[in-house]
Amino acid sequence: MQLSILIGTNRPSLLACSRIAQACSWAGPNVEVIVRDNSGDARKRALLSQFQRDNCKIIIAEPCDALTNASEILKLAKGDFVFLLADDDFGFDHAVASLPGMIEQIGSDQSVAGITGLYAVEFANRSAVVEYKNIDSDNVELRVAGFLSYGGPNVMIYAPVRRELFQRVFSFTNTLPFLCSFHDQIICLLYLLNGRFARLNRLLYLYDMGPWEIDETAQKRDLEFYKAAGFDPAINKLHWLLCAFEGAALVRNIDIFPVIPLTSRQKIADLWFSSMFLRFKGHSRYTFDSPFTGEAEKLCAKLQAATGQLSFHDILSEISEFVALLSKTRAQAYFDFWDAILSKRKPIRQDVASPKLMAAGGA
């Protein structure tokens, strides 16, 4: 089997059902489609059962969180590549039909981590066609720079990726002390560190911005992740700092990607940190009337004024001290995990919170 198309679905809407029906039509000798519904909606379940066919598996699951749904569906995939789809987005028929042939051509080339193409993005009043520059390059520094040069929603998270790589990165991210909405950015970073993305000259995926288009509603979605992890809304102020720190720390210190020279690792880490730190400085983040707003603003001002003067350990200490104001247990878990990463020790996750959501894009 060359390609596994995976849909974990919770929405009971007709739109979601129509997207799933379309995906089921792609099933064939080289493409398996696996749908796992955890909505608990009886009418939807009855409809989905009619979509089952050869190489198309419909799984009716009990209501559960999105992370569990994704974990369970991934266990069933047999394709060399996996293509993860959201049930409210849209894949293009001709692109999907082209994927098995492309996988046949590139499958033995271990320098290829995944497949990219053109992406359609729907806004409230306009549409756009976008692509990522240079992520098909053999040069890892150019790949990461190309990813960072794109300023729109992270549609690369919906790209066909080698199943082995997908599972490896998924397993690692599930060891993180908390899952936040920016972790889709870091997942893509880890993909790019592992290899290039072969380019398909077709529209591959349509992403509807929906609530992510308006800054305040987008940040409310971010806040859902933080609340699920047990955080006060004030942590939202540090959103892009956390992304900057975690991504750069991983580039410098972990070994779940091929051998990359230390000089290149340092360049990529610096590039990642500086790019995300610019977002931290330039993107106004809400605290939603948190009683810790003052402390969050003081820390942001301190860190923004200390550019280039703090080590990773210094930044970790500052973050952990702030998180301790919100929860000492969570602060200790965060510090212990990232201190292990920085010290090149194997981190041990402490289950202080059960993540209920999985990152799915965002601006």
Please state what every model-predicted region is.
Residues 11-25:
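Short, well-formed alpha-helical segments that are part of the catalytic scaffolds
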Residues 21-60:
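Acidic donor-binding segment of Leloir-type glycosyltransferases
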Residues 61-77:
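Glycine-rich, basic loop-to-helix element that forms the pyrophosphate-binding segment
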Residues 82:
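Short aromatic/hydrophobic "clamp" motif used to bind/position activated sugar donors
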Residues 96-130:
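Conserved donor NDP-sugar-binding/catalytic core segment of glycosyltransferases
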Residues 120-127, 194, 200-232:
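Active-site donor/metal-binding and catalytic loop motifs
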Residues 132-151:
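Short, flexible, basic/aromatic active-site loop/helix in glycosyltransferases
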Residues 165, 169, 177-201:
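A short, conserved alpha-helix in the catalytic core of glycosyltransferases
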